[in-house]
Structure formats: structure tokens, C-alpha cells
Amino acid sequence: MPLSHTQQSALVDAMRRYDFPCVTYDFVNRREKTHDSMRGVETEIRGQLLANRTDGVRDGLANILYWGYARIGYRDHRVKQFQEQVTDQQLVEASSLLSRLRGPGVCDIKRVGLPQFSGLSFVSKVRMFLDPCNYVVLDQKLVKLREQPIRTIFCDLTFARRATSIPINKANEEVYERWCQLCRRIASQCLQMSRSGAVDVERGIFQMVASNNALRAAEIVATA
């Protein structure tokens, strides 16, 4: 069902206000890089993930952690842990998989066993950076929409008792794929003039939740 004009306007405004830090890290020269927009972040990380060198893949995965934890104090610790714990074999397997990945792929990525990449939040970030026009992130911020009085796709996620992250299983992979499809549908049918991809729609919903406008976000997700 197409979004109303009011819903489209609210979503486009949220997309424009999305303000997550556009940063990566240059691990060779040991300095942070600030990009003009998320397009720069996407281009750099995708290039690293699809590099023919395992050190490039390692840097791409480390940069997903660096970007994803940009507003959290233990970011550098998580990045360091990953770099110390990831094995050459895991990087070889990841390089082979990421270059040929089809579909949602989050179960396949999880099976590689990369440290720091066990839950759906960060594994979906890997998938998103490979193809941001078609794949998006599903993280804890979006799970908060389950608290709204409107049923959304996120109500279909399954959690183990006392889970602190979104587990990856076949059922949740199916929910993730439906979420990606929903974002693609909004981008192609409702927001054609904005030249947006699926990830821009997801970032708009994320921004709405972060800006205490979760009810409107839930209405959009339930309508589309």
C-alpha cells in the first residue's frame, strides 16, 4: 500500500536529517577519515570488503565496527578485539563468500564465525555495505518499534531468553529479507524523485526512532 503524502514527507525529512557519523579509519596511516556523506563511507567499505587481498577484507570488516560503534565509548576496544582475534582462514572464507553472496546471506556470513559478527545487527551491516541499494541494516534501534501499539514486521523476530542481541536463524533471516524488500518497495514506488536506495529508507526510519518519533515510524512500516 503506497504511503500517504504526509508519510512520504515525514520519511524524506527524516532521511535528510540522518546524522550518523560519516567516518572510517585509515589503518595504514592510523587516522580517522571523515567523508562528505554516507556515499563515501559505502564506497570505501564496499571496496575493502570486495578486495582481492585479505588485509583489505580485514580493514573493511574493522571499518564496519568502527563506523557502527562511532557513538559508543568502547568502539576502539571492539575494533582491536576483532583485529586480534580474526584468523587468516576466516578472512579467506569471508573474501570468497562476500564476492559471490546472493540473497540476504546473513546465515552464510554468520557461519564464517568472524569475531564481533555474530548477531543480526552487525552481520546485516556487512550485507548492506555490499549492496546498499537493495540491502539494509536491522539493528536494536529498529527493534524498539515492537514497543509501539502498531504491529510491524519486527514483531516477527524471534529471540532466545535473555538475548542481548538479535540472533541469526532462518526465521530471522526471512524477517530481514522482508524488511529489505519493504525498504526497496518504498524507495522504488514512493520515493522515486529522491533517487533513494533501500538503505536510505532504512536510515530514515532509524532517524525517526532516534528522534522520538517511533510511532510515526511504525505507521510507515506497517503501511508500506
Where does each model-flagged region fall?
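C-terminal accessory module of base-excision DNA glycosylases/AP lyases that mediates lesion recognition
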Residues: M1-T43, G47, V57-A62, Y135-A224
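A generic structural signal for ordered alpha-helices
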Residues: E42-T43, T87-D88, L120-S121, R161
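Amphipathic alpha-helical segments within well-ordered protein domains
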Residues: R46-L50, K80-Q83, K110, R127, ...
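Short, charged/polar micro-motifs that form catalytic or ligand-binding hotspots
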Residues: L50-T54, V112-G113, M128-C133, N169, ...
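Helix-hairpin-helix/helix-loop-helix acidic hairpins
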Residues: R53-S118
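Short alpha-helix boundary/capping elements
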Residues: G68-G73, D131-N134, V209-N213
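Catalytic DNA-binding helix-loop module of base-excision-repair DNA glycosylases/AP lyases
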Residues: C107-E147
